[in-house]
C-alpha cells in the first residue's frame, strides 16, 4: 500500500539511535534506486503506526517524495514491536535502544517484566537491568546519534 506522510504516526522513532553515515547511504540509495523495501505499520487509533522504517521515512521526506510504500501487520502495536525486534535479531541494537523498547512495552503497553522475558527468550533479570538502565534517562524526542 502507498501511504502519505501525514497518515503516519512516528511515535517509536525515538526508540532507535540515529546513525548519520548509514542514513546518508540510504538517502543515496533511495535517490538512485527508489524505495526497495516497504516500511512496516500497524493500525493505530488515528493513524498508521510505523513499527519499522523510520529511517526510510526520514530519507524519503528529504527527497521530497509524497508517499511511502508500506506493509500492514495485523497485530497489536506491542506484538509488532516485539516481532520486529526478534525478526531483526538486533545484533546492532545498543543496550539503551533495547531498554527504551522494553520500557515502552512495559509502561505504555502494560506488559509485565516476566512476560517480556518470555517473549524475548531472556531472563527477568536481563529485562529488569535494561529497563533500569533507561528508567532515569528520558527517551530522546527525535532520537539520538552515534558518533561517527
Please place each PLM-identified region on the residue numbering.
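Short, charged/polar connector segments at secondary-structure boundaries
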Residues: 1-73
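Amphipathic, charge-rich alpha-helical segments that serve as recognition/docking helices
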Residues: 15-17, 58-136, 144-145
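Short, proline-centered helix/strand-breaking motifs
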Residues: 36-41, 128, 135-139, 148
Amino acid at each position: 500500500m502507498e501511504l502519505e506522510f501525514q497518515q503516519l504516526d512516528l511515535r517509536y522513532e525515538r526508540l532507535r539511535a540515529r546513525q548519520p553515515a548509514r542514513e546518508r547511504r540510504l538517502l543515496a540509495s533511495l535517490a538512485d534506486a527508489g524505495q526497495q523495501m516497504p516500511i512496516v505499520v500497524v493500525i493505530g487509533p488515528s493513524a498508521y503506526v510505523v513499527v519499522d522504517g523510520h529511517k526510510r521515512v526520514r530519507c524519503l521526506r528529504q527527497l521530497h517524495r509524497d508517499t511511502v510504500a508500506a506493509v500492514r501487520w495485523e497485530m497489536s502495536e506491542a506484538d509488532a514491536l516485539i516481532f520486529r525486534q526478534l525478526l531483526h535479531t538486533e545484533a546492532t541494537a545498543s543496550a539503551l535502544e533495547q531498554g527504551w523498547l522494553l520500557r515502552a512495552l512495559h509502561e505504555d503497553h502494560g506488559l509485565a517484566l516476566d512476560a517480556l522475558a518470555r517473549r524475548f527468550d531472556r531472563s527477568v533479570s536481563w529485562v529488569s537491568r535494561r529497563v533500569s538502565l533507561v528508567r532515569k534517562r528520558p527517551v530522546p524526542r527525535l532520537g539520538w546519534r552515534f558518533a561517527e
